[in-house]
Every structure is written in C-alpha cells, then in structure tokens.
Design a protein with these regions (language model features):
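Bacterial N-terminal signal peptides
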Residues: 11-22
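N-terminal secretory signal peptides and thylakoid transit peptides that target proteins
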Residues: 3-13
Length: 265
C-alpha cells in the first residue's frame, strides 16, 4: 500500500461529522443515546434521525465509523444504544457473546459501486474493463477502497476485485480508507483515479455532484446484509429509534439512498 497525501479542502462535505458524535438536538445532547452506525449510513441515517426527532421530539446522537471498529469498542464497553452494522455477521458474534439484547433485525441490503471524480481519465463501468485497461497501461496512480480488515464495504470491494482478477495487480496503487466514507473522500479527492464505495454514498447529493459511478455486479461478492441490534444497556429513546427504523417513513428514506429493504419484492 502507498501513503495518501492529505488535502485540507477536499471532501469536506463528505466527512463532516465522520467518526464524531453529532447531536440532533443540542438541548438534549447530554441524555441522548448514541447510535453507532456504519459509515455507509452517513447521509441516510442522518436524515432518518432528523425525521425521528421532528416526529417524536426525542434526540439521538450519531457516531459513524467502520463496523469492525465499532464491534471492538462495544466489546470494550462503549455505551452505545443501537449498533447498525454493515455486515450482520458482526451482530451475530456480539449476540453470541452476550452484548446485544437479541439477534437484531435486518434493516437494509447494500451495494457497491466504482466511482471516479469529475475529470478522471477512468470511466466507471460495471465490468471494470476501463480499470483493467488503465491498470495494464500503468495509468492508475491510486485507487481507493475501505480497509477490508474491519470495514464490510472494503471486504466486499476486495471480493469483487478478486472475482474480476484485479486484486493483485491493484496492490501497488491501493489506498485504504479507515471506513467507506473515508474511502469515498480518497476516491473523489483528485489524487486518485477513483475507488469502490457504497452505493448509498454515491447517491448522496453532496457526493454525486463530485463524480460518476457504476454499480458493480452483486454476484461478484457476498451480500451486504446490514443488521441492527439494541445493546444491553439501551434505554427508551434508543428503543424508540430502533422501532422508528422499521416504519414506512424511515424505510422510504433508506430506499432513497439505494438500499434494498427486507420484506420488499
């Protein structure tokens, strides 16, 4: 892997609030439960939380990061109310070890895309043919994904690239984001030809304005079955938010960010 140069002004809209707890209602910040949400949910769950607060008057705080890192923090005693994972396997492991109330609920199925910044010589195509051509010609300087060691969207990106036969050849130019939102920042920075990110991020207006994308075939990787669960210490507001996630209003918001929803179709 190669180091990625930082650019202060790049991707400010992408990472606003990333990994930081964001209050939905300042007056209730002290008592509001923390929702630990996978980074692919950055825009979708922010919108859901705003709708939840507007409808119920109850506030939550949002913390975005990689699913694997959150799972580790929960095991170390992090006081989250709800854990919204990008891969249900993490919920299953936590439940087996007694950290969640129950096995939780599937709330969404995610997709991955190849996305390139405006002006990139790389054209996004679902079969990654342009990526292969430019890589063979030595014309890819950097290509971004989330870290597959702990970020499910990085895991699925790796699986897709292995399926396509490009994983090994990309290693010299690969840059890893700590989570998929940071990978999107890297991919759209102008210092990279592009990257593989969450479809839900690519659809957000703040991101869509910065580049173009193509959906990667679902059969190139394992499904992104996204599951949530209440943690053992969750209180009434966390319970209310968890229930709200399953309402038509919340589901409509999630669908608007490209998620397939359990029970549809």
């Amino acid at each position: 892997m190669i180091p990625f140069p930082s650019r202060r002004a790049v991707g400010a809209a992408l990472v606003a609030g990333l990994l930081a707890v964001m209050p939905m209602q300042a007056a209730a910040q002290r008592d509001a439960p923390v929702i630990a949400a996978a980074s692919d949910l950055q825009f979708a769950i922010t919108e859901v939380a705003q709708a939840f607060t507007a409808e119920t008057g109850q506030a939550v705080r949002l913390s975005f990061g990689s699913t694997g890192n959150f799972a580790r923090q929960i095991r170390e005693g992090a006081p989250f109310g709800v854990f919204m994972a990008a891969d249900e396997a993490f919920i299953a492991d936590l439940h087996a070890d007694g950290f969640t109330r129950d096995a939780g609920d599937l709330y969404a199925l995610g997709r991955i895309v190849i996305m390139v910044p405006e002006g990139s010589a790389l054209a996004p195509d679902a079969d990654l043919d342009a990526l292969e051509r430019m890589l063979t010609a030595g014309e890819i300087a950097r290509f971004a994904i989330a870290n597959p060691e702990h970020a499910p969207y990085g895991m699925r990106a790796r699986e897709a690239l292995i399926s396509r036969g490009l994983w090994d050849d990309l290693q010299p130019v690969m840059v890893l984001g700590e989570n998929v939102s940071q990978a999107a920042q890297f991919a759209l920075s102008g210092n990279a030809a592009g990257g593989i990110i969450a479809y839900s991020l690519a659809l957000a207006p703040q991101v869509a304005a910065r580049g173009t994308y193509a959906l990667i075939p679902e059969d190139w990787h394992a499904p992104l079955r996204q599951r949530m669960a209440l943690l053992k210490g969750a209180g009434p507001t966390a319970e209310a938010f968890y229930a709200y996630m399953q309402t038509p209003e919340a589901r409509a918001i999630m669908a608007g960010y490209g998620f397939d929803l359990p029970g549809d179709g």
